Amino acid sequence: MKVGKPLGEYVSRKMFYGLKTGLNEAFVITSGQSQQIVAKSPASVSLVKPFLGGEDIRRYFIQDDGKLMIVIPCGWTKAEIAKTKKGSVSEKQAWEWLKQNHAGIAEHLESFEDALRKRQDQGDYFWELRPCNYYSSLDAPKIIFPDICKAPRFCVDRSGIYLANTAYCLGTDSLYLLGLLNSRLFWFAIANISIPFGTRAGEYRYRLIYQYMERVPVRTIDAKRAMDTVRHDRITQLVDQVLEAKKHLASARTERDKTFYESKCATLDRQIDKLVHELYGLTPEEIAIVEEAKQ
């Protein structure tokens, strides 16, 4: 797999770690808690984001259990107050402002105040998150994946989901790249680049941290080569079909429907794998090695 461009370069180094809150029990809330917060202060809806951990990210789909995250970036409070008041403010004044303008959030976080103040990871005030310069990348369309897994679990997110520090994201929603990442060949490459991180159910798990992922070669497409474009477009089409089939599988209520969509996904996977092998120019012998490797 020496053909292509390293993933880190391919995505312009746009690979980001999930957020470290220092106290998830304070910032990660249920949909019910979110409704209560927004009911008390409707403006707070902009500070509540959909949230996932690495364990929620599966292959081509997301197991969404309705978790949300209160996101108050470092420096946000001062910036908001400065819109209507000039000069510096004390923490007490800033807290009073938060209680007046975002009562639901202030009430919720106040119950965690002691623990929040003890965090190493915090912003200007105990209710803010630590400094982060890639919030816009979390809001944007992206490919997401867990930091540790025993098989490919890459998915696309186009709804602005925020991630825990058990997950990563790539700054692209390319379905072509998603198909490559979830292919047997890519997992074979990752398993040979990354270092095993213990086992689960008798299978090795691998760390998908930046220092390993950035090295995985992504096959670039030469527009002057007709077959490159054909394969790229076909992979994109097939991945789109997998994503749709996964949605149907998740909502299937009968065993017949589940079996149908599971079979459809497996067929699409095989077609994608075949195209990936062709793109990388694998020989029959090399394909056999990849196919025999555990997934």
What is the meaning of each model-derived region?
Residues 1-228:
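Polybasic, glycine- and aromatic-enriched phosphate-binding surface used to engage nucleic acids
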